[in-house]
Curated annotation (Swiss-Prot):
InterPro entries, per database record: Cellulose/chitin-bd_N (IPR004302), GbpA_2 (IPR041029), GbpA_D3 (IPR054063), GlcNAc-bd_A (IPR020879), GlcNAc_Chitin_IntDeg (IPR051024), Ig_E-set (IPR014756)
Family: Belongs to the GbpA family.
HAMAP family: GbpA
Pfam hit, one: LPMO_10
Name the record gives this protein: GlcNAc-binding protein A
Organism: Vibrio vulnificus (strain CMCP6)
NCBIfam families in alphabetical order: PRK13211.1
One MF term in the entry's GO annotations: chitin binding
Key words of the record: Chitin-binding, Secreted, Signal
Subcellular location: Secreted
Gene (name only): gbpA
Length: 485
């Protein structure tokens, strides 16, 4: 068997790769197309300003809805027809009656326009339409469509121009329908699939007294305290008299689709010359949980509607979390040192000052920190004497304005040689329930304390780790229960 030269193999490989990579396109309405594809409206707004939202990554590459060849015998699986099984386009497979912008159409001769970002040899284009009784709230499947294309255009196995238009005879339908346009590339095993969401309006406009002037697009979630409102413009400019405001006063309303629906409902309740929602079969404006078109009454002199927001900006929070401070430090040969940890909330400067009970400053540190930062601080006291001490922590913002101050108490105690065990009955709080009048205990400060006689002896047993007011030597009311020996 004769081997093919390596150079020839490389050339064949490159031609296959380039054929797939270079051929891209989408259904447009730039010149004379009747309607844009679903994916096209993810990137480009329609002439009415309407646009599809929450499309995912495909909004940046509408030309790339490419999938396996051979629909309907093969090609994309049911439920994946709109995305052509492309991971970029998964969102396009969502299918409900109110999910996508619908473009008006009528039965009869209509132009379908393709825009190619890279044209390529073409086998043909085919156009399919949903059955009259299809269910718009189920994923698109072969059963949704009349599988006999209503229009087939031969590509002649040549490159088309960068923009091409096909005149097709669209069948009679009513209401919301989906047209599937398939571009079969001639020299690859791939095709491009574009679904077009359309609405049949009969022989004339369904509501001649109304025209679209904007839309409510649920572009973002809001917060409680925010407000979303309409900005209505007439021939003279913005007219506040027509404004509709919706206060976001519950967690439910913070969700984008929910406030879009609620604002549309409020417009319909409060305005006579403005309506919002998608038009149903009874020519009624029905607010939906998604994009809601806004319509203006003819003769009202109103020109357009925009959406505005009042965003509540929460006041910045400044704080510091202090860790590592003990309730008691023993005085030894070296000066007492406090090893502390700080964690910042907000961009702050923390000032730390240690005072003794006589309000003498013994140590000071200033620490600049950014939001979320952790820092370790060591503070060595200038003198170490037994007794009550205080750590004062001040939190300043970037302008040096005091935002918070807190005081933490701690004790310094002399290091003592423990007395002989026969000088006391218990090491406090061991044996707590046995304490009676004259019971002697060794306290945490190294001193021995004796429980007072009745009626004060009852205080000696009143202690828990969180209720220490009668703790001998250190509690706030220890002298009511104990005598120091």
């Amino acid at each position: 068997m004769k081997k093919q030269p390596q150079k020839t193999l490389l050339a064949i490989a490159l031609s296959v790769v380039s054929g797939t990579a270079m051929s891209h396109g989408y259904v447009s309405a730039v010149e004379n197309g009747v309607a844009e594809a679903r994916v096209t409206l993810c990137k480009f707004a329609a002439s009415t300003g309407e646009k599809n939202t929450n499309c995912g990554a495909i909004q940046y590459e509408p030309q790339s809805v490419e999938g396996p060849d051979g629909f309907p015998a093969s090609g994309p699986r049911d439920g994946k027809i709109a995305s052509a099984e492309s991971a970029l386009a998964n969102a396009l497979d969502e299918q409900t009656a109110d999910r996508w912008v619908k473009r008006p159409i009528q039965a009869g001769a209509q132009n379908f326009e393709w825009t190619f970002t890279a044209n390529h040899v073409t086998k043909d284009w085919k156009y399919y339409i949903t059955k009259p009784d299809w269910n718009p709230n189920q994923p698109l499947a072969r059963a949704s469509f009349d599988l006999t294309p209503f229009c087939v255009v031969d590509g002649g196995m040549v490159q088309p121009p960068k923009r091409v238009s096909h005149t097709c005879n669209v069948p009679e339908r009513e209401g919301y329908q989906v047209i599937l346009a398939v571009w079969d590339v001639g020299d690859t095993a791939a095709s491009f699939y574009n679904v077009i969401d359309v609405k049949f309006d009969g022989d004339g406009p369904a509501l001649p007294d109304w025209q679209q002037g904007g839309q409510i697009i649920p572009t973002m979630n809001l917060n409680v305290g925010d407000t979303v409102f309409t900005r209505v413009f007439d021939l003279a400019g913005e007219n506040p008299a027509y404004t509709t405001e919706l206060a976001i006063d519950s967690d439910a309303l913070t969700v984008a689709n929910n406030w879009s629906h609620a604002l549309a409902v409020k417009i319909n309740q409060t305005q006579s010359e403005i309506a919002a929602g998608q038009l149903n079969e009874q020519n009624q404006f029905v607010p939906v949980y998604g994009t809601n078109p806004i319509f203006l009454k003819s003769g009202s002199n109103l020109q357009r509607v925009e959406i505005g927001y009042k965003i509540e900006t929460p006041a910045p929070e400044y704080d510091v979390t202090l860790s590592g401070l003990a309730s008691e430090y023993q005085i030894g040969d070296a000066p007492v040192t406090l090893d502390l940890g700080l964690q910042a909330t907000g961009d702050i400067t923390t000032e730390l000052t240690i005072y003794n009970h006589h309000k003498e400053p013994l140590a000071f540190e200033t620490v600049a920190m950014t939001d979320g930062e952790n820092k370790a601080v060591s503070m060595t006291l200038s003198k170490s004497e037994a007794g009550h001490h205080m750590l004062v922590t001040k939190v300043l913002d970037k302008d040096g304005t005091l935002q918070k101050q807190q005081t933490s108490d701690f004790m310094l105690t002399e290091t003592q040689t423990p007395p002989p065990s026969d000088d006391y009955d218990f090491v406090f709080p061991d044996g707590l329930s046995s304490y009676t009048a004259d019971t002697k205990v060794l306290a945490s400060d190294g001193a021995i304390y004796q429980c007072k006689p009745f009626p004060y002896s009852g205080y000696c047993v009143q202690w828990t780790p969180t209720a220490t007011q009668y703790q001998p030597g250190t509690g706030s009311h220890w002298q009511m229960a104990w005598d120091k020996l």
